[in-house]
């Protein structure tokens, strides 16, 4: 499925969660898309992704179909939690039939992670499009 998407669209960036089972997927994708990057979802990475997404959303730079309840549920499933050590904060989503592990939200946040911080809602940077099928 990933290879078909790269053949159909002009894919510029692929980031794969390599924390667990994704390591195998990452190795397979690297064979046909060498620029793919692996990402370990540490507490620091999750925090960076969430804070960046909040910044983009608050600035009015994220638009999506209001009828896309799957994406909405996915974002709403992510909650701030104390880490196992009790000394830090992380973000996580419990498994649910509606939102999974918030995979759509994490995918969207990965795309937003490459959005420039200085971009503005009035066009300070080029427009990016993320399509989820």
Regions found by a protein language model. Name each.
Residues 1-43, 47, 51, 55, ...:
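RNase H-like, metal-dependent nuclease domains and their acidic two-metal-ion catalytic environment used
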């Amino acid at each position: 499925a990933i290879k078909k998407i790269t053949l159909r669209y002009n894919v510029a960036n692929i980031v794969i969660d390599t924390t667990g089972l994704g390591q195998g997927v990452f190795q397979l994708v690297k064979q046909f898309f060498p620029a793919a990057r692996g990402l370990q979802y540490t507490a620091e990475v999750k925090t960076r992704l969430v804070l960046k997404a909040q910044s983009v959303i608050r600035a009015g730079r994220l638009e999506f179909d209001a009828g896309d309840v799957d994406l909405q549920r996915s974002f709403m499933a992510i909650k701030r939690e104390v880490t196992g050590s009790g000394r830090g904060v992380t973000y996580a989503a419990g498994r649910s039939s509606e939102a999974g592990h918030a995979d759509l939200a994490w995918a969207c946040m990965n795309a937003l992670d490459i959005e420039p911080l200085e971009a503005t809602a009035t066009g300070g940077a080029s427009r990016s499009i993320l399509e989820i099928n």
